From Swiss-Prot:
The keyword Membrane applies. This is Uncharacterized protein YfdI. The chain crosses the membrane at residues 7-29, 68-87, 94-111, 121-143, 150-164, 179-201, 206-225, 358-375, 382-399, 409-431. Keywords: Cell membrane, Membrane, Transmembrane, Transmembrane helix. It is found in: Cell membrane. GO terms for cellular component: plasma membrane. Its main location: membrane. It is a multi-pass membrane protein.
Length: 443
């Protein structure tokens, strides 16, 4: 295939994806402030009428004014400082376009690490697979200011770095791992996951790899330790809207210090409901104000008292009612993704219909399979991505319980999609390899 034609087709595909997704975005559920507070005035929450064109502050606050330490926030800050030289506005559509271009390239990097795209059939195979990875549930993140979007770009790059064996890949590994692990508290286990792969399956240059993983882990711990503002809410939800509620619903004996009347009520007095997500009450913030002393260790008491919970929790009725890529916030009628409905929205709906209740168990199967696979490329990819996805389930639940679990499980959903993508690419690679071997034998 002529290189100019190949590049033209690739650019055309990227532009089609960007055009289809330009009006698909995410609701601000009061979390945008963590990333944009020093840069622009507060973006209205719970409104579907955002302009996506935001005026920058006349004087951008210093970078140390962030209360929530996140690699995403610092990347956004750097971007805004640069564009402020030329404009007074942050255009979320333009920013999301750049991010989509990088995301598609990360998928292309994984694909070409197995299969060369010198023929039309292989290039269009990539287009089909990449298109399926561009659902509204994924691309809508780029028009928001949620830290989770870091995973969309840097998890594929992390996978690519694991499958290459050169100094450049080691540098890519470091930056990808550092950015993911410091993007949000719930990604803290990522360095340990990568390190466990190296310990058990790939000890080549283990000292360098160990240093990388330790540095990233320490950076993540630092980010968590110096972040402010949301910890008390998370601890309350992890217990009274999480572990205690699970124990109550399953007939387990709760600790004597638990206030039964507050179990199942979030910090604003919304009562958990499987059918509706939640229902309003007149309690308000009374329960939260009375139990600000809760700890994450209290939430983990569930695992200590009932170890079988680690196997049962993913199949809990309350949890399964949250398995939905068309995310909702607390109330099931309050959809997080909004905008133009098109084929990208259809992909999200199809994924929900087919994979709704099997994503977790599928990730577990991917993980088990990775242990026995001989090919080191696919082994590394599936081991790390599946274990990352599994970890996201437990960190999300024990980090904030059932509250907003639908969106908090984004990392698990995307990991499942990426495992499928990698597996299909690998199977196509094996088919091509077998056909080439048969052709060589005939000649």
């Amino acid at each position: 295939m002529n290189k100019a034609i190949k590049v033209s087709l690739y650019i055309s595909f990227v532009l089609i994806i960007c055009a289809l997704s330009k009006n698909i975005m995410m609701l601000n559920t009061s979390d945008f402030g963590r990333a944009i507070k020093p840069l622009i005035e507060d973006i209205p929450a719970f409104t579907y009428d955002l302009p996506l064109l935001y005026k920058l502050k006349g004087h951008i606050d210093s970078i140390d004014s962030y209360e929530y330490i996140s690699s995403y926030s610092y990347i956004l800050y750097t971007y805004v400082l640069f564009i402020s030289i030329f404009t007074e506005y942050l255009d979320a559509r333009v920013l999301s376009l750049f991010l989509k271009v990088i995301y598609i390239y990360s998928l292309y990097a994984i694909f070409t690490s197995y299969i060369k795209t010198e023929r039309y059939v292989t290039l269009f195979t990539f287009f089909i697979l990449a298109f399926l990875m561009c659902s509204s549930s994924t691309l809508s993140m780029f028009a928001s200011f949620y830290q989770e979007q870091i995973v969309i770009i840097f998890l594929p790059f992390l996978v690519y770095s694991l499958t290459c064996k050169n100094n450049k890949s080691m540098l890519l590994l470091f930056f990808s791992l550092l950015i993911i692990s410091t993007a949000k508290n719930q990604f803290i286990l990522t360095p340990l996951i990568v390190y466990s792969y190296y310990i058990f399956f790939d000890r080549h240059k283990l000292i360098i790899k160990s240093v990388i993983c330790v540095v990233c882990l320490l950076a993540s711990i630092f980010a968590i330790s110096y972040s402010k503002g949301v910890v008390e809410l998370n601890k309350y939800h992890a217990t009274y809207f999480g572990s205690y509620l699970y124990m109550k619903n399953n007939g387990y004996k709760m600790p004597s210090y638990v206030d039964d009347k507050c179990v199942g009520l979030d910090a604003w007095g919304n009562k958990f409901d499987i059918s509706f997500g939640a229902t309003p009450t007149e309690v308000g913030t009374e329960c939260f104000e009375s139990h600000k002393d809760e700890t994450f260790s209290n939430a983990l008491f569930l695992l200590v008292s009932k170890p079988s919970t680690i196997f049962k929790l993913p199949f809990d009725d309350g949890v399964m009612s949250q398995y939905k890529e068309n995310y909702f916030h607390v109330y099931k009628k309050l959809h997080v993704i909004y905008g133009e409905s098109n084929i990208l929205t259809t992909i999200t709906n199809i994924k929900d219909n087919i994979f709704k209740n099997i994503r977790f168990i599928s990730l577990l199967l991917f993980f088990i399979a990775s242990i026995f696979i001989r090919n080191n490329k696919i082994k590394a990819s599936l081991f790390v991505v599946s274990l990352f996805g599994i970890s996201q389930f437990y960190v999300s639940f024990f980090g904030e319980g059932y509250r907003d679990l639908s969106k908090h499980l984004f990392g698990m959903y995307f990991s499942f999609d990426l495992c499928l993508y990698i597996t299909v690419v690998f199977l196509i690679y094996k088919i091509i390899q077998r056909n080439q071997d048969n052709s060589d034998v005939k000649h």
